[in-house]
């Protein structure tokens, strides 16, 4: 049996932040916002530290419900850096299927926009596994 090496994609971000710190890593088309590799590295590291201080632990599943864009990518890298398992569910699946997925996955945490937190209050049974809300 061969040994499987562990790899965290966040290590590649650190590499590119060192190699090309001022190069643009992300461009958000609808707003025009940009982030360099250095900015993305620094912001995602700061957020990762905050998630850990908030009580989230490596290996926990965390539901991410924010619109796709710079914040989504930055939070995803932060979650990888913190050792969290991002739970990404396509809202295009429809309400019934999204709720079914959440109930099945039983995430320990949730990082979301206010609307998602409001929905959590309407369907508390679906979100009962969540102990950390951001």
Pin down the residues of each PLM region.
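Conserved AMP-binding/adenylate-forming
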Residues: 29, 33-35, 48-93
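AMP-dependent adenylate-forming
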Residues: 12-36
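Structural core segment of the AMP-binding/adenylate-forming
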Residues: 81-134
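Glycine-rich phosphate/oxyanion-binding loops and their immediately adjacent helices
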Residues: 45
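Flexible, non-catalytic linker and terminal segments flanking ANL/adenylate-forming cores
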Residues: 1-7
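Short hydrophobic/charged patches on amphipathic alpha-helices used for structural packing
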Residues: 14, 48, 98-99
């Amino acid at each position: 049996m061969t040994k499987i090496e562990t790899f965290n994609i966040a290590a590649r971000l650190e590499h590119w932040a060192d190699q090309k710190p001022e190069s643009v890593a992300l461009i958000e088309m609808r707003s025009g916002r940009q982030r360099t590799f250095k900015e993305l590295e620094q912001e995602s590291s700061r957020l990762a530290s905050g998630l850990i201080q908030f009580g989230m632990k490596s290996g926990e599943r965390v539901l991410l419900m924010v619109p796709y864009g710079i914040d989504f990518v930055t939070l995803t890298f932060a979650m990888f850096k913190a050792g969290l398992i991002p739970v990404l569910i396509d809202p295009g699946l429809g309400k019934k299927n999204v709720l079914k997925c959440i109930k099945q996955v039983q995430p320990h945490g949730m990082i979301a926009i206010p609307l998602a937190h409001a929905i959590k209050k309407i369907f508390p049974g679906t979100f009962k596994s969540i102990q950390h809300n951001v």
